[in-house]
Amino acid sequence: MTLNITSKQMDITPAIREHLEERLAKLGKWQTQLISPHFVLNKVPNGFSVEASIGTPLGNLLASATSDDMYKAINEVEEKLERQLNKLQHKSESRRADERLKDSFEN
């Protein structure tokens, strides 16, 4: 898996790259294929902005966060991506439950 990182108005240090790779590896526990993850790191007037876009077989994941600390923004983006991935993984299960309830009310 190739991790694409784009930065605007700042340099990407090895520590930032390593932190991004660690946080992306945490998404691996969902056992789904992550297709072309792309992160955009920006320096904005009130701190740092991180945007992420990752494709999966279930759909696309998009998240962004702004913070005064780059690592904090990266962590927030990872948490948002994890929530979205959890939602996508369990979407079919929740729809199945709705059908069972619908059938029981019709009878």
Curated annotation (Swiss-Prot):
Annotated region (Disordered), positions in chain: 85-107
Disulfide-bonded cysteines: none
Signal sequence, start to end: none
InterPro entries found in the cross-reference section: HPF/YfiA_ribosome-assoc (IPR050574), RHF-like (IPR036567), RHF/RaiA (IPR003489)
Xref: Pfam families: Ribosomal_S30AE (PF02482)
GO annotation, biological process: negative regulation of translational elongation
Gene Ontology, cellular component aspect: cytosolic small ribosomal subunit
Molecular function per GO: ribosomal small subunit binding
Keywords assigned: Stress response, Translation regulation
Induction note: By environmental stress and during stationary phase.
Keyword presence, Transcription: no
Subunit and interaction comment: Associates mainly with 70S ribosomes.
Similarity comment: family membership: Belongs to the HPF/YfiA ribosome-associated protein family. YfiA subfamily.
Described function: During stationary phase, prevents 70S dimer formation, probably in order to regulate translation efficiency during transition between the exponential and the stationary phases. In addition, during environmental stress such as cold shock or excessive cell density at stationary phase, stabilizes the 70S ribosome against dissociation, inhibits translation initiation and increase translation accuracy. When normal growth conditions are restored, is quickly released from the ribosome.
Record-linked NCBIfam families: yfiA
Protein name (database record): Ribosome-associated factor Y
The gene coding this protein: yfiA
